[in-house]
Amino acid sequence: MADSSFDVVSKVERQEVDNALHQAGKELSTRFDFRNTGASIEWSGEETITLTADTEERLLAALDVFKEKLIRRDISLKAFDAGEPAQSGKIYKLSGSLVQGITTENAKKITKKIRDEGPKGVKAQIQGDELRVSSKKRDDLQAVISLLKGEDFGIALQFVNYR
């Protein structure tokens, strides 16, 4: 019997983030407490999102609105790395970026976790910014998935190409 395998990746559907961004922008423009505060949210580049507002409190409230929209669209908050609010003139700005791909350091942590606590006979290989996990038994692969879901590696993990 051939080996079964799956890939562990950390990717975000950009269209879903775009939808969440537009929903948050619409809410910022219509909500009463955001009127005349200059609060806005927009893309700045391919992977960066910028929030602006007149006060730091309104900026953080706008960030909460955006995070709420991400959660509603089933996007993990670990996939969005929000920076610190910075003041430029009379406007406060906050830039955040999307976190995609598994770094080599995180991939090594995940493979070590699988080797130490996973079922015997399970192999994990680092392939660029993803991880291939293979085994002869599918039950072992499901045990590895539940093991990884129960652990926090600081990034959003997805399990794809299960075969």
Swiss-Prot record:
The keyword Transcription regulation does not apply. This is Nucleotide-binding protein RHA1_ro01989. It holds the Pfam family DUF520. Belongs to the YajQ family. InterPro entries: DUF520, UPF0234-like_C, UPF0234_N, YajQ-like_sf. GO terms for cellular component: cytosol. Keywords: Nucleotide-binding. CDD domains: YajQ_like (cd11740). NCBIfam families: PRK05412.1 (NF003819). GO terms for molecular function: nucleotide binding. Nucleotide-binding protein. SUPFAM superfamilies: YajQ-like (SSF89963).
